[in-house]
Amino acid sequence: PLRLMMKLGAVPDAFTWHVESFYRTNFPKGKGFTQAASEVPAAPGDLPEAAVEAFSVDDSSTTEIDDAASVTHLDGGRSRIGIHIATPALIMPRGSVADESARSRMSTVYAPGMKTTMLPESWIERTSLDEGKCVPCVSLYVTVDDETMAVQSTETRVEKITVKHNLRYDLIHEEVTPEAIENGTLTVPCAHEIGFLWRFAKARLAEREERRGRPEQTGRIDWYLELEGEGENLRIIRKGR
């Protein structure tokens, strides 16, 4: 039937048929949002603003910046690592049109060459952790020893942060290497913080391997796909780990 419809001109190509079939099945009311779902309430005015210099790392195509990290050095040879998560739910009334819409979608749909967001653009603009914006978030703080990287304490806060940098993975991944971190030659923004988090991640890896009794599997490969046009141009890019 598909080949017949394409031959008769009812369907331009197989790509269009598959995409439209997916959306008819999963978005029977359409991909758009109602005006009511797009209305964004004001954020609470009494949230404290954290004194951190946070940064995010995403691909250049990412418009919903939903997480960021920070490293703040304390006295006594300690540092505080912050993991900051965007929190549109903080200002989204339970049972509202926006809430019901988000619950029905559950997630943003990602596919090569297309993306259908879980939230309306107005919500993304208000709550995304964009560079230079002061926005609400949920922060997990981990205080660690600078030398041993041992975790000393943890804390969770609801607050506001201003993200200093939105780093783009595809623009810096060739520069961010273990050798550059170890040699102190990394020159990308937040190089010191990236190096500190790398050391922290290595310490956690060593802990996991000790408990497991065997090395963690490495060498796994990630792929990044870029689709141009109507599916005729596909770039497959190997991502480092």
Language-model features, listed with the residues they occupy:
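Low-complexity, highly charged intrinsically disordered N-terminal segments
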Residues: 1-53
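Electropositive polyanion-binding surfaces
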Residues: 33-241
